Amino acid sequence: MAEAAAPGTTATTSGAGAAAAAVAAASLTSIPTVAAPSPGAGGGGGGSDGSGGGWTKQVTCRYFMHGVCKEGDNCRYSHDLSDSPYGVVCKYFQRGYCVYGDRCRYEHSKPLKQEEVTATDLSAKPSLAASSSLSSGVGSLAEMNSGEAESRNPSFPTVGAGSEDWVNAIEFVPGQPYCGRTAPSCTEVPPQGSVTKEESEKEPTTVETKKQLCPYAAVGECRYGENCVYLHGDSCDMCGLQVLHPVDAAQRSQHIKSCIEAHEKDMELSFAVQRTKDMVCGICMEVVYEKANPSERRFGILSNCNHTYCLKCIRKWRSAKQFESKIIKSCPECRITSNFVIPSEYWVEEKEEKQKLIQKYKEAMSNKACRYFDEGRGSCPFGGNCFYKHAYPDGRREEPQRQKVGTSSRYRAQRRSHFWELIEERENNPFDNDEEEVVTFELGEMLLMLLAAGGDDELTDSEDEWDLFHDELEDFYDLDL
């Protein structure tokens, strides 16, 4: 009996479940169901059935508008951009430098004038009215959603289901405050582009802005075009930018002058590169500009001849110890003595250009801290004639004075003091030709002694600095050292 009753019980239970399911189905038929698209689907959220959709087919797919809808023909939303009142304009095209060109997925069009924008808004009204008529079919569902939102957030105002702009609801944009359907009307946070009363008072008037050049048009293209409140200048023939003020003659002449100066510098650089690129070093026989190591692509310009050498080779030649000074200071080809070598990125031949290069080299050296002076902690053998900067940690410059104290021995300190005394005596009391040989001998002895003093002081002498100092002594005292 128990075994026979069990199937009956089961049948009774299943019949009750079927009746409940029928009642639930009948109640659901009165509420039209709308399948919301999945926000994380990356497309229109459609399934395999491409024929369905209903009212959604009249709504343009937002993913298709951005060119990233992965549903394709199966998307339940419309892929017809002609139904969309607004197109997605490429922001890079508006700035004037879209690299995709005609292959860009976004719209390449000029900004609309105010009249065209007004006409577009008027033509968009019928489509909004048609979309609002569709909202009656989903009214109950919208009311349910808004009721649930109101119960969760009682302070938020409820947005009616029959709003005309529900299709064009504000989307989330990174960097801007989000305004959803159940969120406040964003009055607390001013949207991007809005200004407060105080800011509007500080802004210049229309008359003032019309006198100022548009900064966007000056560097490329202004997205506002003819509707820009600022003045679009005339194009410069030199740089091609809209930077010439139509009325201000002083501004026009100043800009043209600066453009001409920049053009002349560019031409000088072009000529320098042209005469430099094929120069071959006379020692290693390599094209200097084609060396494998970029740091070796520099010339060593000799002060008294025009033979070509790379900086590495000529410095190696002049640092040889097995020859006397007269040999290593002379050019390897013509044997003309040059007191120093000027490093240069470009090849220079003219004497005036060499003088400019030497002056620039000295100025560059004067901006570098002297390693011998060491911010007042050391002692520089060149004293006030040093080409490097003698400055203390607080920025104060060293006052010119005689160097009386050495670093390694009392004898060298006395000889250095005597050296500077001879210089002061030469400046105050010019001597005759009979005493010139004695002074020449003294100066030569002092220079040789100072050059040989680096080992005891654990300092490495700068060849360029000694060469420049030697040349300055010869020019100042008219001596041949």
Curated annotation (Swiss-Prot):
| Tissue expression summary | Highly expressed in embryo, in specific cell types of the central nervous system, in brain with the strongest levels of expression in the mantle layers and in testis. Moderate to low levels in somatic tissues.
Signal sequence, start to end: none
> From which residue to which do the RING-type zinc fingers run?
281-335
Q: Where are the zinc fingers (C3H1-type)?
A: 55-82, 84-111, 208-235, 364-393
List the catalysed reactions: S-ubiquitinyl-[E2 ubiquitin-conjugating enzyme]-L-cysteine + [acceptor protein]-L-lysine = [E2 ubiquitin-conjugating enzyme]-L-cysteine + N(6)-ubiquitinyl-[acceptor protein]-L-lysine
Q: Name one GO biological process term.
A: cellular response to leukemia inhibitory factor
Q: Which PROSITE patterns match?
A: ZF_C3H1, ZF_RING_1, ZF_RING_2
- Pfam families linked: MKRN1_C, zf-C3HC4, zf-CCCH_2, zf-CCCH_4
Q: In which pathway does it act?
A: Protein modification; protein ubiquitination
Could you tell me which PANTHER family the record lists for this protein? E3 UBIQUITIN-PROTEIN LIGASE MAKORIN-1, MAKORIN-RELATED
What's this protein's function?
E3 ubiquitin ligase catalyzing the covalent attachment of ubiquitin moieties onto substrate proteins. These substrates include FILIP1, p53/TP53, CDKN1A and TERT. Keeps cells alive by suppressing p53/TP53 under normal conditions, but stimulates apoptosis by repressing CDKN1A under stress conditions. Acts as a negative regulator of telomerase. Has negative and positive effects on RNA polymerase II-dependent transcription.
Which protein is depicted?
Answer: E3 ubiquitin-protein ligase makorin-1
Q: What gene is it encoded by?
A: Mkrn1
